[in-house]
């Protein structure tokens, strides 16, 4: 079987969605076409360990290495969405994978007093 040929994309965008249960990182080209994707669950973490900062860091290091090796990516803009624990450690993982972070943006959706929130948990 022939080896898959990847195109050269030197700059990209990392979309990080950090929920309380998991962290998902997808890397796209500047037009928004997804090149590679990884989540903490896809990196081998199961159950409550998916929502940890360590799981987010391992997933982002993996996806950063994929983007660097397969697409020759060097510089990356980061868009973070969500309140999860893996926000900062996912950015740290991209840096440790050898990618230079050129732009950081928080895209967490905030309601302007929209829907009524769910009831508070009583533990």
From Swiss-Prot:
BP terms from Gene Ontology: translation
Single GO cellular component term: ribonucleoprotein complex
Family: Belongs to the universal ribosomal protein uS11 family.
InterPro entries documented for this protein: Ribosomal_uS11 (IPR001971), Ribosomal_uS11_bac-type (IPR019981), Ribosomal_uS11_CS (IPR018102), Ribosomal_uS11_sf (IPR036967)
PANTHER family per the UniProt record, alphabetical: 40S RIBOSOMAL PROTEIN S14/30S RIBOSOMAL PROTEIN S11
GO molecular function list: rRNA binding; structural constituent of ribosome
Protein name as annotated: Small ribosomal subunit protein uS11
Keyword Repeat: no
A Pfam family it matches: Ribosomal_S11
Subunit structure, interactors included: Part of the 30S ribosomal subunit. Interacts with proteins S7 and S18. Binds to IF-3.
Protein function: Located on the platform of the 30S subunit, it bridges several disparate RNA helices of the 16S rRNA. Forms part of the Shine-Dalgarno cleft in the 70S ribosome.
Highest taxon in the source lineage: Bacteria
Keywords carried by this UniProt record: Ribonucleoprotein, Ribosomal protein, RNA-binding, rRNA-binding
UniProt-listed NCBIfam families: PRK05309.1 (NF003698), uS11_bact (TIGR03632)
């Amino acid at each position: 079987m022939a080896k898959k040929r990847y195109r050269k994309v030197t700059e990209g965008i990392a979309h990080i969605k950090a929920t309380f249960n998991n962290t998902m990182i997808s890397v796209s080209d500047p037009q928004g076409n997804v090149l590679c994707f990884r989540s903490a669950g896809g990196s081998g973490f199961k159950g409550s360990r998916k929502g940890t900062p360590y799981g987010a860091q391992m997933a982002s290091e993996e996806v950063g290495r994929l983007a660097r090796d397969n697409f020759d990516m060097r510089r990356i803009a980061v868009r973070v969405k969500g309140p999860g624990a893996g926000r900062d450690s996912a950015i740290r993982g991209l840096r440790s994978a050898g990618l230079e972070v050129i732009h950081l943006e928080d895209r967490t959706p905030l309601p302007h007093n929209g829907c009524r929130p769910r009831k508070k948990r009583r533990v």
